[in-house]
Swiss-Prot record:
Function (record text): Cleaves peptides in various proteins in a process that requires ATP hydrolysis. Has a chymotrypsin-like activity. Plays a major role in the degradation of misfolded proteins.
Cross-referenced InterPro entries: ClpP, ClpP/crotonase-like_dom_sf, ClpP/TepA, ClpP_His_AS, ClpP_Ser_AS
Entry protein name: ATP-dependent Clp protease proteolytic subunit
Main location class: cytoplasm
Active-site residues from the entry: 98, 123
Length: 194
């Protein structure tokens, strides 16, 4: 059972209650606090599109605490972040691993942040396939193409060479918030909200 807090606001028309995520959305805050999958991606994409339609000139604040997940679902979020006119500021709270770290780096340059005790982890895409040898070969080629594409995007987002990104994503690569800043995945470590 999932518990979602309700917030009650006083207005001149009386009281109004919201679930906490709807209330945060009013302040242009989007949360990813679970695995990236088709359902979470659909919700996040819808929120990004809604906020851009509401005011394309105002920033959107995307808070990330995620172990990662589906590459295709994550790429739907990534593409939407790049497509919309609104700047998307990303903030790591807790952990941004795998696709979570990729989305963290996808924020508007200069507006990518992490809290001081956050942890960021990058690695190569994972895949497990079974079936006929020909089909396994097709899937292996696909995952190698995806790996190359993700590494190129990380290289572009961080300023690191493609060779360094390839080496650094060969295995799980955990970083503190400060290390992620040095690497170029984020721009600043927050200790207090500005």
């Amino acid at each position: 059972m999932s518990l979602v807090p309700v917030v009650v606001e006083q207005t001149n028309r009386g009281e109004r209650s919201y679930d906490i995520y709807s209330r945060l959305l009013k302040d242009r805050i989007v949360m990813l606090s679970e695995e990236v999958n088709d359902v979470t991606a659909s919700l996040i994409v819808a929120q990004l599109l809604f906020l851009e339609a509401e005011n394309p000139d105002k920033d959107i604040y995307f808070y990330i605490n995620s172990p990662g997940g589906s590459i295709t679902a994550g790429m739907a979020i990534y593409d939407t972040m790049q497509y919309i006119k609104s700047d998307v500021s990303t903030i790591c709270i807790g952990m941004a691993a795998s696709m979570g770290a990729f989305l963290l780096a996808a924020g508007e340059k200069g507006k990518r942040f992490a809290l001081p005790n956050s942890e960021i982890m990058i690695h190569q895409p994972l895949g497990g396939f079974q079936g006929q040898a020909t089909d396994i070969g097709i899937h292996a080629d696909r995952i190698l193409r995806i790996k190359k594409k993700l590494n190129a995007i990380i290289s572009e987002r961080t300023g690191q060479s493609i060779e360094k990104v390839e080496k650094d994503t060969e295995r799980d690569n955990f970083m503190t918030a400060e290390e992620a800043k040095e690497y170029g995945l984020i721009d600043e470590v927050f200790t207090k909200k500005k």
